[in-house]
Amino acid sequence: MFVVIFGRPGCPYCVRAKNLAEKLKGEVADFDYRYVDIHAEGITKEDLSKSVGKPVETVPQIFIDEKPIGGCTDFEALMKEQFGIVA
């Protein structure tokens, strides 16, 4: 499983998602992730909206194996359901 987290500096939900991904990387085989700072990379909400397929107003925006799954709360729920791991 490969997760990409699009976030920005100062975003507490981005930090939570990144921390959970780091925890999963250490505990789940074949799990890896990439954190993308949208400000540093010059990515706009419009760019993210195109990737997600609907308007994006918040970050983080999280993709699992290239499929958009939503934000931090969605990611936490999926990881708890799939692996029993919580942030």
Curated annotation (Swiss-Prot):
Disulfide bond residue pairs: C11-C14
Record GO terms (molecular function): electron transfer activity; glutathione disulfide oxidoreductase activity; protein-disulfide reductase activity
GO biological process: cell redox homeostasis; cellular response to oxidative stress
Keyword terms, alphabetized: Cytoplasm, Disulfide bond, Electron transport, Redox-active center, Transport
Domain Glutaredoxin residue range list: 1-87
InterPro entries per the UniProt record, alphabetical: GLR_AS (IPR011767), Glutaredoxin (IPR002109), Glutaredoxin_subgr (IPR014025), GRXA (IPR011902), Thioredoxin-like_sf (IPR036249)
SUPFAM superfamilies noted in UniProt: Thioredoxin-like
Gene3D superfamilies, per database record: Glutaredoxin (3.40.30.10)
Localisation: Cytoplasm
Similarity annotation: Belongs to the glutaredoxin family.
Functional description taken from the UniProt entry: Has a glutathione-disulfide oxidoreductase activity in the presence of NADPH and glutathione reductase. Reduces low molecular weight disulfides and proteins.
Quaternary structure note: Monomer.
Name of this protein: Glutaredoxin
